Amino acid sequence: MLHKKWWKVLSFILLLYTCTYGFLVKVPKLDDRMQESIRNFFFHVPMWFGMMILLFVSLVYSIKYLRSNSLVHDVYAQAYAAMGLIFGVLGIITGALWANYQWGSPWVGDPKQNGAAIALLIYFAYFVLRGSLVDAEKKARLSAVYNIFSFFMLFPTLWILPRLTESLHPGGQGSDGNPGINGKDMSANMRTVFYPAVIGWTLLGVWISTLKIRVQMIQLKKEGLL
């Protein structure tokens, strides 16, 4: 039984490691204001990585649904999209807390903040669409198409348009090119926490998604749709 749960155990261990060593590891002092707040990097950025991975899985299942018309695939797509959206909201919240300390306000209209907000609103519309439809087959079909559209909208809103202008985010000024992550600012010590954090948070998202899937599958069986 344990061999089937190894990844859940791994998620727990990695997050325990992140939440302990992440506050103990030596971090670089980039400026007088950043100081210890840079530890939020172990929580804020992995949320966005986890979101992208979970939404990609949701995309795959939406494509599978359009090929198979199986409501099982729709259940998977919806569950992973929901968890991805939650990770995105957590990314916004942790970013706002960091911005309030670093920039003096939780929301300063930074291009990356605005792009992230637009991306999340697009995915919120996915769930509004699902809630507005009654017929299960029609809901699954239209949702799958919209989910595919939503995923590809992540690229201009998160990765392309915000990088065409300067940002208050690290590396977003001058000739650095406004990268998604400024690798120069992440020390070797930080990497020992950051990468496990990405894996740990993502596995947690998958774990919660599987629980949601089990509940939805039971509901569909009760309704006679499976």
Language-model-derived ranges and their functions:
Residues M1-L226:
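Polytopic transmembrane helical bundles with strong interfacial aromatic enrichment
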